[in-house]
Curated annotation (Swiss-Prot):
This protein's record includes keyword Ribosomal protein: no
Gene3D superfamilies for the chain: 6.10.280.30
Single GO BP term: neuron projection development
Superkingdom of the organism of origin: Eukaryota
Protein name: Stathmin-4
Residues with PTM Phosphoserine: S90
Chief location: Golgi
Localization per Swiss-Prot or TrEMBL: Golgi apparatus; Cell projection, Growth cone; Cell projection, Axon
GO molecular function (one): tubulin binding
Tissue expression remark: Nervous tissue.
Keywords (A to Z) from UniProt: Cell projection, Coiled coil, Golgi apparatus, Lipoprotein, Palmitate, Phosphoprotein
Lipidation feature positions (S-palmitoyl cysteine): C20, C22
Length: 189
């Protein structure tokens, strides 16, 4: 089997990498593995959790079947046998635990109330700041509007004054033309 084929099969079977333990059972008695021309010798490693069966060997490659063995629980000690038996708690211990639980509950309540008070205070500050900003905006808008109205009033008055001046000049000019015309008519008689 080539190394590339073996690696490819191992990629296809990710669980095999979890269950396979390729360690030497007795490193002193077993000869060391020799790497030869991109091949893997499956007899070199001891695989305790799986079995590899060669199915077909031909020039184009090799096929094999990997059979995972079920886990065995031989030699595993029972948990109950190793654990010491729990003794019943005394009335004083129960009372102490209840008092400690009550203190924890009160502390948690106090922390929650403190947190809520801080949150409310922060909300009040945010609302107060928003009101102040709104009032400042209204004040600035009123000032701008008053300035604009004053400017418009001044421009209008200046425009009216200029129009009146032009009308007065036209009236003067018309009066002069009339006088000149009357003088010419009297002179021509």
């Amino acid at each position: 089997m080539t190394l590339a084929a073996y690696k490819e099969k191992m990629k296809e079977l990710p669980l095999v990498s979890l269950f396979c333990s390729c360690f030497l059972s007795d490193p002193l008695n077993k000869s060391s593995y020799k790497y030869e021309a991109d091949t893997v010798d499956l007899n070199w490693c001891v695989i305790s959790d799986m079995e590899v069966i060669e199915l077909n060997k031909c020039t184009s490659g090799q096929s094999f079947e990997v059979i995972l063995k079920p886990p065995s629980f031989d030699g595993v000690p029972e948990f109950n046998a190793s654990l010491p038996r729990r003794r019943d708690p005394s009335l004083e211990e129960i009372q102490k635990k209840l008092e400690a639980a009550e203190e924890r509950r009160k502390y948690q309540e106090a922390e929650l109330l403190k947190h809520l008070a801080e949150k409310r205070e922060h909300e009040r500050e945010v609302i107060q700041k928003a009101i102040e900003e709104n009032n400042n905006f209204i004040k600035m808008a009123k000032e701008k509007l008053a300035q604009k109205m004053e400017s418009n009033k001044e421009n209008r008055e200046a425009h009216l004054a200029a129009m009146l001046e032009r009308l007065q000049e036209k009236d003067k000019h018309a009066e002069e033309v009339r006088k000149n015309k009357e003088l010419k008519e009297e002179a021509s008689r």
